[in-house]
Amino acid sequence: MQTRITRLLGLDHPLLQAGMSWASSSAALPAAVSAAGALGVIAAGPMYPEALRAAIRELRQLTAAAGCPSAPFAVNVPLYNKRAAELLDVVEAEQVPILIASQGGTRGHLARFQSQGVKWLHVVASALHARKAEDAGVDGVIAIGGEAGGHPAPDEVSAMVVVRAVLRAVRLPVIAGGGVADGAGIAAMLAL
């Protein structure tokens, strides 16, 4: 199935594995997701730069061993993190193809990554934040609702509501996040 997201990110399937702190701060889960044709995501939040570098390299080894040496993958960096600048340096040095930024503005980093061909997706919890991300020049947004793990919107509005509002507010490709855990949820989000 081809969508704006599959075309933008070079995926076979319009599915993205969330950056789930400790659950995806190692390479195994994101590598399996990427090898299956969706977007695997390494969660950099709980990591130190050296561990992130090792996870990126291991993911590449695992996807190559699975016969998918050029499988797209992403790293999620929470921009509020006190190590965010160091983590972004690792993402740049390791030539990660897709960066997912969350919990903060682009802070002057966006141009640096886009000039190298990196796709920048920004996690948003409202139409207002989506418009700000679009105005900053990001490549796409991940609209999350109250069902999302990590740091969802404080008002806990459903992803179905947030995603619809974001789709009306921006022209960017939009990925739905939060509470999408089975085929019915995927079908519902694709119908928006």
Tell me the role of every PLM-derived stretch.
Residues 187-192:
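A compact, surface-exposed functional segment
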Residues 1-173:
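Active-site entrance/lid segments in N-terminal catalytic domains of soluble metabolic enzymes
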Residues 21, 172-186:
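Glycine-rich adenosine-cofactor-binding loop
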